[in-house]
């Protein structure tokens, strides 16, 4: 009885063991299949990740390329703009330099003209002051010459001679004042004719006397501070060898 029970227990145990073993094999196969499936899934995931990574890298590369191109284009545009601005600046500098040169030349010219104008104005003013009495002296000469003619008038009357002597002293005093003021008589009698100092009213032809010589003074001339106040009116001797031969 005990042997049969033991045998039955043993058989049951063996059966259970077989079933367990079978179950174990099935589990291992399942595990293998699961492992394979997992590996496949992992591979797929890896491939997906790789593909995504590649796509991402490609996208990044494309973006980087576009970014580089975009960055490069602004740099080129900026360089062109800078070059253009530098050219414009250089042209403006040249224009400014030329304008400054023209302005400087014009300024120097105007300054020179202003200096010359001031000099002329000062000279004119000085001459006006220097010769301020010219008109007065010119107007005084005529009565002075009339007085001289009266003094030179011959007379036998002693009383009149005394008066004439007094007039002569007065005339000499007036002449002295005029000389002190810079008035001097132009020498003309028997002097070579000078058109700057002499004015010929008459001409004669006398070969015995020097040609172009003043033979007579018709009206006295005067200088006032070395300027001609009035030219001397003269009679001039004019002759030449041709005129002598023709005669």
From Swiss-Prot:
It comes from the Bacteria. Keywords: Chaperone, Cytoplasm, Stress response. Homodimer. One of its GO terms (cellular component) is cytoplasm. Residues 31-49 have a biased composition (Basic and acidic residues). GO terms for biological process: protein folding. PROSITE patterns: GRPE (PS01071). This is Protein GrpE. It is found in: Cytoplasm. GO terms for molecular function: adenyl-nucleotide exchange factor activity; protein homodimerization activity; protein-folding chaperone binding; unfolded protein binding. Participates actively in the response to hyperosmotic and heat shock by preventing the aggregation of stress-denatured proteins, in association with DnaK and GrpE. It is the nucleotide exchange factor for DnaK and may function as a thermosensor. Unfolded proteins bind initially to DnaJ; upon interaction with the DnaJ-bound protein, DnaK hydrolyzes its bound ATP, resulting in the formation of a stable complex. GrpE releases ADP from DnaK; ATP binding to DnaK triggers the release of the substrate protein, thus completing the reaction cycle. Residues 31-79 are annotated as: Disordered. Belongs to the GrpE family. InterPro entries: GrpE (IPR000740), GrpE_coiled_coil (IPR013805), GrpE_head (IPR009012). Residues 50-68 have a biased composition (Low complexity). CDD domains: GrpE.
């Amino acid at each position: 009885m005990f042997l049969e029970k033991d045998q039955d227990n043993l058989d049951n145990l063996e059966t259970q063991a077989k079933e367990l073993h079978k179950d174990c094999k099935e589990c291992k196969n399942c595990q293998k299949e699961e492992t394979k499936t997992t590996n496949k899934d992992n591979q797929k995931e890896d491939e997906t990740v790789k593909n995504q990574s590649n796509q991402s890298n490609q996208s990044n590369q494309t973006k980087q390329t576009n970014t580089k191109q975009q960055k490069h284009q602004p740099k080129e545009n900026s360089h062109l703009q800078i070059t253009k601005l530098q050219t414009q600046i250089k042209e403006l500098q040249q224009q400014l330099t030329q304008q400054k040169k023209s302005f400087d030349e014009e300024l120097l010219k105007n300054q020179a003209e202003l200096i010359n104008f001031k000099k002329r104005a000062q000279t004119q003013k000085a001459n006006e002051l220097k010769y301020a009495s010219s008109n007065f002296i010119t107007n005084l000469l005529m009565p002075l010459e009339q007085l001289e003619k009266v003094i030179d008038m011959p007379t036998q009357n002693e009383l009149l001679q005394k008066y004439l002597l007094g007039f002569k002293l007065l005339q000499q005093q007036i002449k002295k004042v005029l000389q002190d003021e810079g008035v001097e008589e132009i020498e003309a009698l028997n002097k070579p004719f000078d058109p700057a100092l002499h004015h010929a009213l008459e001409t004669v032809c006398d070969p015995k006397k020097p040609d172009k010589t003043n033979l007579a003074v018709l009206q006295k001339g005067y200088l006032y501070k070395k300027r001609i106040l009035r030219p001397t009116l003269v009679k001039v001797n004019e002759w030449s060898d041709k005129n002598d031969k023709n005669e």
